[in-house]
């Protein structure tokens, strides 16, 4: 177990969503504007549904912060669901049940397994919590963690590389382009590919269908040696993969060259080392994606995640009605046609949490002054290795 942990609570159409972060060092300065800016990024994206026109997510801090600085206590965050006023009859915590039960479970969703596991008769009891609305609080948590990382010189960015089979021209994308697309409604660095992606999304929306895609996360400024090979559950690659796979609709994660490693010989995969003029080693390639042996190796961290199409279709798939056993069309909920750009923001947030936890665990400190000093001393020791070689 690391130093940081968080839990979230709340339903998609409930009164509010909540998160509690435990283990943050005291003295971390937090910007309310930055917290809200990350939530706004999650709400944007070409292909999002009508819900995003209702909600304007803003973070309320209920504990653990005074005058803009963490105090070492658990940090409690809340986002109010403005749409709750339209759902009070169906989501009342103590009132009598009202509204039609959802029994036509959706293929690809948590509906069927959830009602069986928790012995429910209404799939709304499942879909309200399994909804990706929960990621609002993951982004809020990530917004805190990325401010901690920024104070340590570590930067996180992402971009969408594929939607619905339309892919960017990776060779044409410069490293400096990634992270400057935050205002783009697709978070895409390739304008030509972005135009084709929008066309595919429009086509899918007309057909009542949905689209998935791929996003890439890039992290710069990480020290060499973050993570460890000594135990399976402390390997940084495993922790990152698990965090990203926990995001709703994510079906695959790869680091660096990823699955391409299976098709090529080692001579074409492993990054050769060279000694630079400054007396430090460097690599001409980064197929490892910045991770070797479960540890950072000094190169930028590169992680990609594949998102499946959202399982709520406006042209529903066939399913069964759990109340009657008959073949019916799956139920419909207000949903998105494509949420890959939003998922990239959630991916950044989960990456930020894992890395913030790794840093706080490895350079353990109860306050930011000591944490920054500990990391600075470690970086200085690594620099001396090559100076004295």
Residue ranges and their predicted role:
Residues 1-389:
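Generic N-terminal targeting/processing segments that precede catalytic cores or assembly contacts
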């Amino acid at each position: 177990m690391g130093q940081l942990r968080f839990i979230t609570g709340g339903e998609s159409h409930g009164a509010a969503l909540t998160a509690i972060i435990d283990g943050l060092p005291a003295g971390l300065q937090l910007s309310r504007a930055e917290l809200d800016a990350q939530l706004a990024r999650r709400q944007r994206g070409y292909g999002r549904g009508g819900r995003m026109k209702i909600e304007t997510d803003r973070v309320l801090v209920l504990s653990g912060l005074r005058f803009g600085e963490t105090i070492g206590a658990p940090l409690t965050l809340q986002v109010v669901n403005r749409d709750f006023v339209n759902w009070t009859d169906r989501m009342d915590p103590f009132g009598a049940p009202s509204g039609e039960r959802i029994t036509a479970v959706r293929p690809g969703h948590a509906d069927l397994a959830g009602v069986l596991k928790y012995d429910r008769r209404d799939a709304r009891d499942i879909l309200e919590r399994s909804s990706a609305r929960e990621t609002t609080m993951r982004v809020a948590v990530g917004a805190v963690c990325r401010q901690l990382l920024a104070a340590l010189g570590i930067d996180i960015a992402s971009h969408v590389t594929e939607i619905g089979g339309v892919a960017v021209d990776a060779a044409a994308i410069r490293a400096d382009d990634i992270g400057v697309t935050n205002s783009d409604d697709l978070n895409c660095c390739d304008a030509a590919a972005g135009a084709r992606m929008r066309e595919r999304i429009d086509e899918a929306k007309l057909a009542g269908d949905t689209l998935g895609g791929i996003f890439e996360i890039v992290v710069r400024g990480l020290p060499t040696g973050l993570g460890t090979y000594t135990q399976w559950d402390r390997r940084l690659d495993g922790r990152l993969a698990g965090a990203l796979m926990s995001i709703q609709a994510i079906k695959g994660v790869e680091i660096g060259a990823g699955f391409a490693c299976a098709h090529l010989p080692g001579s074409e995969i492993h990054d050769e080392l060279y000694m630079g003029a400054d007396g430090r080693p460097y690599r001409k390639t980064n197929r490892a994606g910045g991770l070797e042996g479960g540890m950072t190796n000094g190169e930028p961290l590169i992680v990609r995640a594949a998102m499946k199409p959202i399982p709520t279709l406006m042209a529903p798939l066939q399913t069964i009605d759990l109340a009657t056993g008959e073949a019916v069309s799956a139920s419909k909920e207000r949903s998105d046609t494509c949420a890959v750009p939003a998922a990239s923001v959630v991916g950044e947030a989960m990456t930020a949490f894992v890395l913030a936890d790794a840093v706080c665990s490895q350079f353990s400190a109860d306050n930011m002054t000591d944490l920054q000093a500990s990391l600075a001393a470690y970086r200085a020791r690594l620099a001396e290795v090559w100076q004295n070689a």
